[in-house]
Curated annotation (Swiss-Prot):
Source organism of this protein record: Triticum aestivum
Record-given protein name: Defensin-like protein 2
Pfam families referenced in this protein's UniProt entry, alphabetically: Gamma-thionin (PF00304)
Site (Interaction with trypsin): residue numbering on this chain: 11
Keyword Disulfide bond: yes
Length: 47
């Protein structure tokens, strides 16, 4: 199963999946990407 959660530390609009993924990795997640109509940074990991 894959768990997704909005990044706690990402600031501003999410325009780069790479930047989002780096923030998520620092938060202990497996990665992340920009998602949804408001382009929020969502972190992902196996759970």
């Amino acid at each position: 199963k894959v768990c997704r959660q909005r990044s706690a530390g990402f600031k501003g609009p999410c325009v780069s999946d790479k930047n989002c993924a780096q923030v998520c990795l620092q938060e202990g997640w497996g990665g992340g990407n920009c998602d949804g109509p408001f382009r929020r940074c969502k972190c992902i990991r196996q759970c």
